[in-house]
């Protein structure tokens, strides 16, 4: 296994980093700030260990149907189209933000799920291997099964997805504490 480092994310850490994140992404969209904050703080901790390159899992949800909203597309038989659309628009939706937030700390992200050959292969996998049905709460089935078959613990391989900004508590800190008293638009001037 890989060594795991755990850091508590506090209100003061989020507050102290907010201006840097908003300036890095150049927007005051709360969801983008929350996601950007997770990348920013993770890359900051990585940089503190003098590491310059990190691996990101970006692309897995778009390739293998990981987002909950894909269940509607599955029901309407439009999942393949939506996955392809999301892949085509991924740079402006996710990658640009993540790159800006990680590079603000001097850390370059590598994106193995966006390898050209893997993308071409994954986009041609039938949707039934990605989402098992319209009520599939886990999604990304082929990816989870592969991870488990390669030796990843079942509890980890089949753990329900939780967006980083929610799992870290950053979204809650931003909404309930930090942004109550701050006009983020000021950081964009």
What feature does the model see in each segment?
Residues 1-150, 165-179:
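ATP-dependent adenylate-handling active sites, centered on carboxylate activation for C-N bond formation
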Residues 153-160:
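A short alpha-helix-loop-beta-strand transition element characteristic
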Residues 183-189:
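Long, intrinsically disordered, low-complexity Ser/Thr/Pro-rich regulatory/activation regions
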């Amino acid at each position: 296994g890989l060594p795991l480092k755990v850091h508590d994310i506090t209100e003061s850490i989020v507050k102290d980093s907010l201006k840097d994140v908003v300036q890095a992404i150049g927007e005051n969209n709360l969801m983008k700030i929350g996601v950007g904050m997770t990348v920013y703080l993770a890359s900051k901790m990585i940089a503190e260990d003098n590491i310059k390159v990190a691996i990101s899992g970006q692309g897995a949800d778009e390739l293998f149907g990981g987002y909950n909203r894909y269940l509607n597309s599955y029901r309407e038989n439009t999942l393949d189209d939506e996955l392809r659309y999301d892949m085509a628009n991924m740079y402006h939706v996710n990658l640009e933000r993540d790159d800006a937030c990680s590079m603000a700390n001097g850390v370059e992200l590598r994106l193995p799920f966006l390898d050209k050959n893997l993308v071409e292969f994954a986009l041609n996998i039938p949707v039934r291997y990605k989402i098992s049905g319209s009520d599939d709460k886990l999604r990304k089935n082929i990816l989870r099964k592969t991870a488990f078959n390669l030796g990843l613990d079942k509890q980890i391989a089949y753990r329900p997805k939780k967006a980083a900004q929610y799992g870290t508590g950053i979204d809650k800190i931003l909404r309930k504490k930090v942004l109550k008293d701050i006009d983020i638009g000021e950081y964009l001037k």
